[in-house]
Amino acid sequence: MTRESAVATKRNWAILAAGVGLVYVLVRHRHRLLCPLRRVWSFGSLVPQRRIEVINSVQDPTTQWVLNELKNHCQTFKVLGFDCEWITVGGSRRPVALLQLSSHRGLCALFRLCHMKQIPQDLRELLEDDSVIKVGVAPQEDAMKLSHDYGVGVASTLDLRFLCVMAGHKPEGLGKLSKTHLNYTLDKHWRLACSNWEAKTLEPKQLDYAANDALMAVAIYQKLCRDLQPKHFWQRRQLDDNSMHNKFEPFLDVDFTKGFTLNPSGSGVTRSKGSTQSKSNKWVPKKQPYRQIATRTKDFYDNCLLQAPDGELLCTIDRRKASWYLNQNLGTHISEEPFTVRLNFEPAGRAVGDVGRFYQTIKKNQCVVCGDRDAYIRKNVVPREYRKHFPLVMKSHTSDDVLLLCPTCHQLSNISDLRVRSKLAVQCEAPFKQEDGSVKYHDDPQLKRVQSAGKALLHHGAKIPAAKKAEMEKTLLDYYSDQTDITEDLLRQAASVEYRVENSDYCQHGERVVQQYRDHFGGLVELERLWRQHFLHTMQPRFLPELWNVNHNADRLEVRASEGRIDKADLMVAGLDAKIKET
């Protein structure tokens, strides 16, 4: 080999090595390199297409054209950016002045409701169409304002912060979301946000502000959806609209702020799927209205074996329960691995059919949704607020109702449960959360004033100004109409008045729902089936225990009934008495 050819060979190898190194760097850091480009593309691609249409009147020919365009755009992508603007006068909110709707193709329709005598029928239909998702930050609040001010319902609102949590991102306001995910800075100056939206003509800056809010919501939705659809970095594909809608269905029309906390354990969960944020960057609200839930890293299932006297496998149990049988001389230790106990007495029942085989199977210590094994929390598929009101036969031996979820999946599951609770509240007339019927006691304003006046006059009468003192004395004499003078006995009586009175409309949500299903909606197995089906539909678990099924408890009760181990009254409560008679 000549010197020249040797040099050329070395140069070629060097170029090849450099090329391989460059490819490695690009592949290794592809997300860091491509994410800024994708952010710019996500919103930048919509900017040239942006068309702002201002609608001032129902009679305006543009009105129907804009509505037809929005509907056509929703045929291919059933999502609209949604926002509202209004003004406040003297501390009171005026009716919504401006409604903003934006499609994924950049059409931004600004409906000036303050100048329109009525809302067009086609606009009502679009807002009430539950197949079209209206996205934004806190869109439920805007929907409530529209309903209050104009009597129009807005169906299928979706808070973008739910998507942030699902994708492992920090849930923020629209301005910060646009900067974080699209690298676009929205003008959120307070003077612009609080400008006169009822003006005869809106300024160009107002039009940009209003249109960009709605358009940005659609762009952020698209970006977060792509984060939730894993793919190779070289792939570019259309969003699967149907699968996304199914995934988000549990969060439609749900208020993001109702008891939400990204870190439910408060116990230092160190990671969040889909995110590389450090623990210190996790978002936790200042107020946490719910008790904190502890995660566990120790195995939940010990998978010890319990046998009948003849050696037949009955079920798997935890180590503590197995040790209890031994300590009570109710069983004999058979083997150490797996830890096996054989009973010294004949059990009430044996493993029968798939119901029995479910209890015999080995359970894995992992999240049933995603398979994570690092940390998990027990999830009651039928929430305890309902299960605790079930008859004993439907509360005991229901280990199938307890599943393991990782902290992130547990949080998402709890959020999705809010939708079912709200539906049950309406169906069963069982107030939920802060509605009037959920408060057991309320304050009687008159009695509260009487008690306050009595205490003040009794303990601080000499320090109270004459005018205020006279007002308090009048309050007492108006209430105690049979008295003419303020005496110490009267003051003591007033100071001890109980102003908290029982709410005659009070009902406990869980108890009322259980009662209604027991008496009117097919029995408690139907309520169980509702919750278990909801869990399957919303969480789509991929690692459920073998033989787990929606009707497990109903099948278990039927087995017990066939063995004569359940009362007829319990069957009626469960809703199985008619079915048992048929068989």
Curated annotation (Swiss-Prot):
Amino acids binding a divalent metal cation 2: D83
Enzyme class, UniProt record, top EC level: hydrolase
Binding site for a divalent metal cation 1: D83, E85, D213
GO MF annotation list: 3'-5' exonuclease activity; 3'-5'-RNA exonuclease activity; metal ion binding; nucleic acid binding
Cofactor(s) in the UniProt record: Mg(2+); Mn(2+)
GO cellular component: cytoplasm; mitochondrial membrane; mitochondrion; nucleus
GO biological process, one term: positive regulation of mitochondrial translation
CDD domains documented for this protein: WRN_exo
Residue ranges that the UniProt entry lists as topological domain Mitochondrial intermembrane: 1-11
Main localization (coarse): mitochondrion
SUPFAM superfamilies the record matches: Ribonuclease H-like
EC number of this enzyme: 3.1.13.-
Subcellular location per the Swiss-Prot or TrEMBL entry: Mitochondrion membrane
Transmembrane feature ranges: 12-29
Location of region: Disordered: 266-286
UniProt remark on cofactor binding: Divalent metal cations; Mg(2+) or Mn(2+).
Phenotype upon gene inactivation: Developmental delays and premature female germline stem cell attrition, reduced fecundity, associated with a dramatic extension of lifespan that is reversed with an antioxidant diet.
Cytoplasmic topological domain: 30-583
Subunit: Homodimer.
Functional note: 3'-5' exoribonuclease required for mitochondrial metabolism.
Family, per entry: Belongs to the EXD2 family.
Protein name (database record): Exonuclease 3'-5' domain-containing protein 2
